[in-house]
């Protein structure tokens, strides 16, 4: 089980979230956000953004080291082989990704496994799984994921959370304005991308999230 303190302000990003910058500058930006007080970090890199595999590994290891120095869990999105190779703190899987049982077998009992859920059927199935925490969404429209499902909104989120017994974070299009409403629901925190990557002062936003959850 994942300590719920780690789920309050769960930050997700990769170099592609700073597409206007070089990989090296994007890494610097991500580290600044890590230093703002986020509680967990999920490394999520999408698209052909690296010159070669060595550049990817250099990027991953630098971000992992920064997270370790800050005592922040370093979670790898989707890539189970990478998570095993660098001994990440865990892996986050989507519904179409590797089976949780396989991830557990390869990672061992002490690593974190997260699972994305989008509807009641997936949420109910996840209750019986070995996932340490769930990410439920998208709650609102989001531009951070090109393949995101249709957002289901706050009303359906409340209904879905009634059947949940696991540690869980809300994700998808979360803004400063929606934080107050979400904090009144049985969520352990929020997972955010653009709310922090586009922020001029991420520390203020992180502080607000910690005050609410």
Set out the residue ranges of the language-model regions:
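Conserved N-terminal beta1-alpha1 strand-loop-helix module at the mouth
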Residues: 1-92, 96-98, 106-133, 149, ...
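Active-site phosphate/pyrophosphate-handling residues
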Residues: 81, 155, 191
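As written
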Residues: 130, 185-187
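Glycine-rich beta-strand-to-loop/alpha-helix junction loops that act as flexible
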Residues: 136, 169-174, 190-194
